[in-house]
């Protein structure tokens, strides 16, 4: 049996797809090949995502490949997947999640707490920028885009004091040794689905059940809780929004942030994990009442 798995052309996207292929090979005797696709989001790098249509731009071209039956499945970073799936598509599995935290990589290994006043920090994320300003109002936030390596190189090229990147991506491309500091999830609430990979298929695909073996239940319901939170707030890359759900002893805890009326609101909620979707919705409702 041969499966074609679509993914973006970036090194990180290809590594993430290889992770899924390795998991598939361990579970089933399946030959897999990658179909590399340059998405609209990859082509337009000089403009911020919220001005050109959002993170869905990383997904749409890949879904077209599945519609045209050029690919059997796709691998995405769940933080790039819009909360509304197109008709006929589904996320069939979310394997065990990687580290969800954000990391700081600095020039000359200077710690975040030791940054000079007015330090220039690179990030294209509204969520990161807003939380950086809460931690250090004096910081100068510089918008940057590009793949992981490109953004790290911009520290010197654009005379930055540092950049903020997801720990998961750095680990997957073996660049985590460059990390200067890790942000706690309460001081820098992660993006919805950060650190998680999702396998997308057409609902009618005859072999889709093979991917279900890769599902990690607790990781999946945590991501689904975060996505319920985002859906209730109608959040996207135009929004300053983040959430992180975690589970301990069957109890789920979710922390979420959302910008409302020019104010960053942060709330937390706890409940049994079987109520994961209700918890995400309830947390959003608490924020809307603030």
From Swiss-Prot:
This is Porphobilinogen deaminase. It catalyses: 4 porphobilinogen + H2O = hydroxymethylbilane + 4 NH4(+). The modification S-(dipyrrolylmethanemethyl)cysteine is found at residue 237. Belongs to the HMBS family. Transmembrane segments: none annotated. Monomer. It comes from Clostridium botulinum (strain Hall / ATCC 3502 / NCTC 13319 / Type A). HAMAP family: Porphobil_deam. GO terms for cellular component: cytoplasm. Pathway: Porphyrin-containing compound metabolism; protoporphyrin-IX biosynthesis; coproporphyrinogen-III from 5-aminolevulinate: step 2/4. Its EC number is 2.5.1.61. Coiled coil: none annotated. The lineage of its organism: Bacteria, Bacillati, Bacillota, Clostridia, Eubacteriales. InterPro entries: HemC (IPR000860), Porphobilin_deaminase_N (IPR022417), Porphobilinogen_deaminase_C (IPR022418), Porphobilinogen_deaminase_C_sf (IPR036803). The keyword Cell inner membrane does not apply.
């Amino acid at each position: 049996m041969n499966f074609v798995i679509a993914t973006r052309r970036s090194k990180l996207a290809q590594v993430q797809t290889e992770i899924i292929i390795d998991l598939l090979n361990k579970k089933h005797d399946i030959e897999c090949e990658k179909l590399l696709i340059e998405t609209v989001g990859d082509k337009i790098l000089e403009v911020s995502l919220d001005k050109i249509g959002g993170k869905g731009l990383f997904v749409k071209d890949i879904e077209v490949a599945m519609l045209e039956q050029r690919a059997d499945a796709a691998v995405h970073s769940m933080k790039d997947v819009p909360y509304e799936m197109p008709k006929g598509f589904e996320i069939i599995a979310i394997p065990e999640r990687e580290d969800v935290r954000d990391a700081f990589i600095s020039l000359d290994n200077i710690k975040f707490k030791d940054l000079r006043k007015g330090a220039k920090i690179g990030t294209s994320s509204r969520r990161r920028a807003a939380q950086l300003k809460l931690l250090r109002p004096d910081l100068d936030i510089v918008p940057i885009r590009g793949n992981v390596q490109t953004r790290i190189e911009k520290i010197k090229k654009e005379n930055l004091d540092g950049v903020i990147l997801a720990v998961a991506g750095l680990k997957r491309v073996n660049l985590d040794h460059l990390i200067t500091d890790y942000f706690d999830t309460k001081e820098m609430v992660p993006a919805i689905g950060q650190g998680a990979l999702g396998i997308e298929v057409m609902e009618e695909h005859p072999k889709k059940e093979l991917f279900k073996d890769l599902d990690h239940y607790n990781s999946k319901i945590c991501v689904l809780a975060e996505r319920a939170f985002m859906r209730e707030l109608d959040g996207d890359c135009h929004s300053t929004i983040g959430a992180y759900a975690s589970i301990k002893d069957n109890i789920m805890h979710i922390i979420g942030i959302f910008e409302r009326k020019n104010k960053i609101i942060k709330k937390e909620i706890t409940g049994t994990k079987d109520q994961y979707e209700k918890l995400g919705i309830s947390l959003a409702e608490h924020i809307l009442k603030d």
